[in-house]
């Protein structure tokens, strides 16, 4: 259920409307499940780099006020198509909560950028407990396998909930087939593109 709206400085002043309703709402909202004691931050717009710092400071202050444990999520490019690794990072004293999870420590030095990076940075600077999860995913297509791995190995155990991920497997097959069709069309288009090439001498 809708719990609160974010009116942080730097966010675009736009109105979001939905199907089957006449009302509008702000683009960045917080939804709550009181029974499970869960909060979800949803944004219908991209947060621009110029607004990320202001937004992160605004939201992090609210996290501290309500004593929430934020879970930040970002993606990194898959190393192969066979595995989906999930890596964990933490701020404050939350690192110990990663020990019992099926997530790896990052195998190399890296940077979390964008709005998620700004949120993690603000949590660290304010000594706020938070967990960050970096999941291997496709940079070009929706990746249900990555979503499934993230939910089952990170979100479910931390939040103590169960999520039905069967639909994600079905979507993974659909997306895989769509990717193959797209690759075939791209190859066919490439074969037909304009080009110049030598054909040998003739008289």
Label each PLM-derived region with a short phrase.
Residues 41-42, 72-75, 134:
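Short beta-strand segments
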Residues 46-96:
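Internal, conserved structured core segments that host functional sites
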Residues 80-156:
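Catalytic cores of processing enzymes, dominated by hydrolases/peptidases
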Residues 1-66, 125:
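N-terminal catalytic or cofactor-binding beta/alpha core of small enzyme domains
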Residues 47, 51, 111, 142, ...:
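Catalytic cores of large soluble enzymes that bind and process phosphate-bearing ligands
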Residues 3, 10, 15-17, 161-203:
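Haloarchaeal acidic low-complexity proteome signature biased toward cell-envelope/secretome components but also
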Residues 60-69, 125-129, 156-163:
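Secondary-structure boundary elements
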Residues 51, 55, 59, 115, ...:
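General structural feature for long, well-ordered alpha-helical segments within catalytic domains
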